[in-house]
């Protein structure tokens, strides 16, 4: 089980990323666009730098939905490998079977 504070911090970051996502995308488009002038690029870059660090999506951590485990995360299920294994053995994940060949 992950620390409650780490799980809460990650959720707080997720909210901040969501709040700033649209504006960040606009600024990045201005920076990348060959049609924008150098002054516009500098202004967009400085505004992007003024935003909070936690507004960047790369600072998010994928965590197990059940207990918040940060490692061994499987995107398909939103769970860690340990939790997936437990649920598969219990038969709680429909359509998933142990591999055999």
Curated annotation (Swiss-Prot):
Keyword DNA damage tagged: no
GO process annotations (BP): translation
GO function term, MF aspect, one: structural constituent of ribosome
Gene3D superfamilies: 1.10.287.1480
Record keywords: Ribonucleoprotein, Ribosomal protein, RNA-binding, rRNA-binding
Pfam families listed in its UniProt record: Ribosomal_S14 (PF00253)
Assembly with partners or alone: Part of the 30S ribosomal subunit. Contacts proteins S3 and S10.
Protein name: Small ribosomal subunit protein uS14A
Organism listed in the record: Mycobacteroides abscessus (strain ATCC 19977 / DSM 44196 / CCUG 20993 / CIP 104536 / JCM 13569 / NCTC 13031 / TMC 1543 / L948) (Mycobacterium abscessus)
